[in-house]
Regions:
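Rhodanese-like catalytic fold shared by cysteine-dependent sulfurtransferases
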Residues: 1-37, 41-77, 84-131
Length: 131
């Protein structure tokens, strides 16, 4: 499956991917940590409350000092709550010399939850036998 990336226009172009596209890759059998890395840059209390399975967790404030934990041979999809800290993390990693491909998850966890498949309707109990 090819990456569907968008480059945003601006001072610094940044590759982005939607939550739906990440979900599609996971549904197609790709696993976070094998063909790509999901990097969660939120704070530990945020991650404890809610996380994407398989994400590597490095808070924004530690991302540069811990960039050696990231595999530059794999695409790294960076996410946070809404997409702001992940953009900061990408910029910081680039400035620090990280050579791998960095992609921002557009909208972060908010978009992740909005992209979740709708829950199936609750089934009705079987009709009572009134005989």
């Amino acid at each position: 499956m090819q990456w569907k990336l968008r480059k945003r226009k601006g001072v610094t172009a940044m590759e982005e991917i939607t939550a739906s596209e990440v979900r599609a890759r996971l549904a197609a059998g790709e696993r976070a940590g094998r063909s790509f890395t999901l990097l969660d840059v939120r704070e530990p209390d945020e991650v404890a409350a809610d996380a994407i399975e398989g994400s590597q967790r490095i808070p924004l404030g530690e991302v540069v000092s811990r960039m050696g934990e990231l595999d530059p041979a794999r695409v790294t999809i960076v996410h946070c709550a809404a997409g702001i800290r992940s953009k900061r993390a990408i910029k910081a990693l680039r400035r620090a010399g990280f050579t791998g491909e960095l992609v921002n998850l557009t909208g972060g966890m908010k978009a992740w939850h909005k992209s979740a498949p709708a829950a199936p309707p609750a089934s009705s109990p079987p009709p009572r036998d009134r005989s």
